[in-house]
Structures are given as C-alpha cells and as structure tokens.
C-alpha cells in the first residue's frame, strides 16, 4: 500500500542471489556461477525530503531512500555454461517497457544500470564488499539499480513491465 510510504515512487530492478563468495576479477561466467538465481522485481522508494529535493549526501541520511522491494519472478542460474553465457548476453542487452495505467512511461534498457548492465552493478557491489566484508549478502536479493526513472505511485495505480528477453511476459503490480 503506497499510503505507508513518504512520496513513494516505483522502480523496476534486476536482482541476484549469491550462493558463494565471488571476487571482482572473475569473468562474467564465473561471476554468475556464484549466483544461485536472478530475477526481476520492483522497489518502492521514498523520500523524507519534500518534493524529492535533496543532495546526494542526503540519500545516506535517508537510508538510500529504500522503502520496500518485491520480487516478481526469480530464475535459477543453470549449471550448463552455454545457458549461462546466453543469460549474460540477455542481461547486457535487454529492453523493458514500463506502463502506468496502460500508458507507456518509459522504455528502459540494461545499459541504464551504471551505463553498462546489472552484472556491472553486481561486480561493483562485490568490489565494495571486498573492502567491507560485513556487507556481503549470501542467499538474499542484491538489487542492481533501477532500469528506468522512478515514477510516482498513487492509490489504485496499476503498473506493468515487460522485458523483451529474460522473462518474456508482462508483470502487473496494482496499488
């Protein structure tokens, strides 16, 4: 329910779940082999700063503006290397169409995440954890950043998102 958040916004995000500790110098195939699964979800972000007017350091004080993350679909990483390579390629090249109340808001793409892909965000997280090992999360979702801009959520809004690969179906989120 959006009412329990402060000026909530909607963001689609890819996530990974690590099953073993990776290192930042691994190839993409080795890195994804450390994951038990990946998936698509949505994050509700919020701002304690009225009108979403703040400076970058304020996001730390606002706990990264995180509200809640909801997993929409999760897929196990296959054991076959050819299938892993195919997933890596799709993670680097997907497009996502985001709609609100049947109106297209934006067409996002994988390269919107750190100007590269969700794997680049996962690798950046691993680099951070190599210096801050207490932050490493195993068996829990590691989100990779929004694929589109964040959009306002109001009561009774219906969002849908559709990817051209990875998960070939439309996901509906109702408020």
Q: What do these predicted ranges mean?
A:
Residues 118-154:
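A conserved acidic, glycine/proline-rich C-terminal tail/linker
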Residues 1-117, 122-123, 150-160, 168-175:
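Catalytic-core "active-site belt" of small-molecule-metabolizing enzymes
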């Amino acid at each position: 329910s959006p009412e329990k958040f402060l000026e909530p916004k909607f963001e689609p995000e890819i996530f990974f779940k690590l099953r073993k500790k990776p290192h930042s110098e691994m190839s993409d195939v080795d890195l994804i082999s450390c994951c038990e699964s990946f998936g698509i979800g949505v994050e509700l972000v919020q701002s304690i700063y009225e009108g979403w007017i703040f400076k970058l350091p304020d996001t730390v004080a606002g706990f990264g503006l995180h509200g809640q993350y909801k997993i929409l679909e999760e897929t196990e990483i296959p054991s076959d290397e050819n299938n892993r390579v195919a997933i890596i390629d799709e993670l680097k090249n997907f497009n996502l169409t985001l709609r609100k109340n049947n109106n297209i808001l934006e067409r996002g793409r994988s390269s919107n995440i750190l100007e590269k892909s969700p794997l680049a965000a996962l690798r950046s997280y691993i680099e951070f954890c190599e210096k801050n090992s207490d932050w490493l999360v195993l068996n829990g979702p590691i989100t990779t950043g929004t694929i589109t801009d964040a959009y306002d959520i109001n009561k009774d809004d219906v969002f849908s998102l559709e990817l051209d690969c990875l998960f070939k179906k439309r996901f509906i989120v109702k408020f």
